[in-house]
Amino acid sequence: MRNNHSLRLQLWFRTLFTVGVVTLLMIDAFVLQNNKEDDKTKEITTAVNMNNSDAKEIQQELEDGSRNDDLSYVASKRKVPRGPDPIHNRFLLLSRFILSLLTNPYPYLHICVLDVSV
C-alpha cells in the first residue's frame, strides 16, 4: 500500500513540475513577443515624430556624400585581398596530393642503401 502511495506522490510532483516548466516557457514566449511589438511601436513613433525638414536634411546629407565621394564610405568598404584564394585552392592541393599518392604510394619513405665494405 505504501509503495502505491509513493508512486502517486512521485507522479503528482512530476506533473506539477512539468506544468510549471511549460507555464514558464509560455510566459517567456509571450514576454518576448510583447518586447518585439514594443520595439516596432517605438520605431513607428520615432518615424512619425520626425519632422519633414529633418527627413529632408538627412536625404540631402546622403545625396551629398554620394556625390562628393565621401571618404568614410570608401574606408568602410571591405577590402578583398589579392592573390591566390586558399579556401578554393585547397581542393586543387588535395587532388595533387592524391595524384602523387597514386603515382608513388610511399612518397615520404626513403630507402637508404649503405655500402658496407669489409
From Swiss-Prot:
Residues 1-29 form the signal peptide. InterPro entries: CLE25/26. The keyword Secreted applies. Keywords: Developmental protein, Differentiation, Glycoprotein, Hydroxylation, Secreted, Signal. Glycans are attached at residues 51, 84. GO terms for molecular function: receptor serine/threonine kinase binding. It comes from the Eukaryota. One of its GO terms (biological process) is cell-cell signaling involved in cell fate commitment. The modification Hydroxyproline is found at residues 81, 84. GO terms for cellular component: apoplast. The keyword Glycoprotein applies. Belongs to the CLV3/ESR signal peptide family. This is CLAVATA3/ESR (CLE)-related protein 26. It comes from Arabidopsis thaliana (Mouse-ear cress). The gene is CLE26.
